[in-house]
Every structure is written in structure tokens, then in C-alpha cells.
Amino acid sequence: MPHTLLILNGKESGNPEVREAVKNVRDEGLTLHVRITWEHGDAKRYVEEAATLAVSTVIAGGGDGTINEVATALMSLPADKRPCLGILPLGTANDFATGCNIPLQIENALQLAVKGRAVAIDLAQVNGEHYFINMATGGFGTRITTETPDKLKAALGGVSYFIHGLMRLDALKADSCKIHGPDFHWSGDALVIGIGNGKQAGGGQLLCPDALINDGLMQLRLLTAKELLPAVLSTLFNGEKNKNVIDATVPWLDITAPNDITFNLDGEPLSGRHFHIEILPHAIQCRLPPNCPLLG
């Protein structure tokens, strides 16, 4: 069997369930290398090391940010030398893993990441050098995911983002910008911007419910009203029609703004005044369950 490399977020290095799951894989006679990340850049170094270890699968063990870092590192390799991506969800929200129906039980998830079916999936590229596998969010949602206290996330998981958002409703502020893509043009003040390769963000909120990870497209969703709560937020996440929610499905987008705005790319912040975002079809292989709802 080909070798597998698990890149594990340092916060989970002492997790006894992870240790037991790794032991069980090795007891089957499979080769599973483990590397621990402690700072930004470690994942890229370990992905580069994968080539010398004859690794066919690199597993991202952590949350959405860890998955992003590993997927981004894979894109730095030549296409014919890229290992397959596996996912061991260990974060607060685990939005991409949950959206894919990847088991949240550590033993089951690791077995899938090692042995599961490899499927070609899309990645989104931002300004030619940054990537996201799940979603880019801007506006109020970005500020909430960035500012939610770690202790609240640890105690409540994904619902912590929603609770912290309710606490910060007095700080609502829209971002002025222009957005255009194929047959789509919009300008105005956006309170929430969601650009989805995957469907959900912020701990399970279906921000881009029509998105798929293998269709060569991304879903744009804008919330433009300020007189929203709670009705318009309910509309945004429950799929009801509302004049303040704008949808588009496109292969690329250009976003320009008079002032700096910040997007979270799978939780990783990127600020600027111009963003070119495009889908790279079938960019990487990912081990996914047969019932993955993000596949078309």
C-alpha cells in the first residue's frame, strides 16, 4: 500500500483519540507518517517532504484553516506530483468536512482519509497566489469569525459564531464594493459576502446552498440590507426569497473596493481593495465518502 502522511495541528498533538486511531491504522500494516505543525509554514514544509517519503495521500488533521494550509501547499507542487488530500476534522466548526459528510468520529474519519475513494475537486484561487477549498466570506460574517473568543469556540463549537454575532449586532457595518463576473454586475454596500466552493461557513450556516466542489463554478451570495435581523438573516440561511439577498453562479469574479475590505479564506484573513477570484476545476484529488453532498 502507498504511504500516507498526517499533518496534525499542534493543538491536537496530545489527543488520545488521534493517537489510538493512528495506532489502529499502523496495526493494519499500513505506513502512516505523522508530522505536527506549530507555526505557519510548517504544513508547506511537510507537504514538500511528502515527495521524499513516497506519500500518495496527505491528511490535514485540524480545522478549516489547517485544511486550507495543506491544500494551498499541495497547489505549490506540480500537478502530476500532487498527493491526494485526506481530511481528519479536528477544528471548531469543521465546515468543509461537515459539508462533505466526512465523519466527525476520529477513527472513522482517519480510515476514510487513508482508504477512501479519491475524487477530483475544484479549488478557488484568489489574486493568483491564495486559495480556498470551502468558502471566502466578507463583511459582518468575517468580523464575527475573526473576533469570536477562543474560549467561547472551545466551549460551544460552531454555534459560538452565531452567539457572538448576536452580541455584536450593534456593530453592523457594510462594505462598499463593485463585483462583476460573466453576465453579472453589481455595486453597492454589502453587509455579508459569501463566495462558496462549499456550501456552509460559520459553524454550519448554509451560506451558499447551491455550491458544488466539482462543477467548475462558485456561488456568490450577497446580503445588502441593513434592516435585516432576524428575518433577513433567516432568509439568508434558510433559502427563502428576499430582495436583499443576491445570488449568482460564476467561474470567476472581480471585486474592487474604495477602502480595504477583508475576506476570510477558509478562516484565513486577506485584506485589500481588489480581488480576482477564479475556480480551478479538478485542481486536487480528495478522499471523500460516497454520499458526499458537495459532488454534482
UniProtKB/Swiss-Prot annotation:
Cofactor binding annotation: Binds 1 Mg(2+) ion per subunit. Ca(2+) may be able to substitute.
Segment forming the signal sequence: none
Primary enzyme class:
transferase
> What EC number(s) is this enzyme filed under?
2.7.1.-
**One of this protein's Pfam families, by short name?**
YegS_C
**Predominant cellular place of this UniProt entry's protein:** cytoplasm
What processes in GO biological process is this protein linked to?
phospholipid biosynthetic process
A GO CC term attached to the entry: plasma membrane
User: Which keywords appear in this protein's UniProt record, sorted alphabetically?
Assistant: ATP-binding, Cytoplasm, Kinase, Lipid biosynthesis, Lipid metabolism, Magnesium, Metal-binding, Nucleotide-binding, Phospholipid biosynthesis, Phospholipid metabolism, Transferase
Annotated residues for binding of ATP = 37, 63-69, 92
Check the record and name the Gene3D superfamilies matching this protein.
Answer: 2.60.200.40, Probable inorganic polyphosphate/atp-NAD kinase, domain 1
Highest rank taxon of the organism: Bacteria
The residues covered by the DAGKc domain are 1-130
Q: What compartments host this protein? A: Cytoplasm
What are the names of the required cofactors? Answer: Mg(2+); Ca(2+)
- Detail which positions bind Mg(2+): 212, 215, 217
InterPro entries, A to Z: ATP-NAD_kinase_N, Diacylglycerol/lipid_kinase, Diacylglycerol_kinase_cat_dom, Lip_kinase_YegS, Lipid_Phosphate_FormReg, NAD/diacylglycerol_kinase_sf, YegS/DAGK_C
The UniProt GO MF terms for this protein read: ATP binding; lipid kinase activity; magnesium ion binding
Per its database record, what is this protein's job?
Probably phosphorylates lipids; the in vivo substrate is unknown.
- Name the HAMAP family for this protein: YegS
Give the record's family classification: Belongs to the diacylglycerol/lipid kinase family. YegS lipid kinase subfamily.
What protein is this chain from?
Probable lipid kinase YegS-like
Species source reads Yersinia pestis (strain Pestoides F)
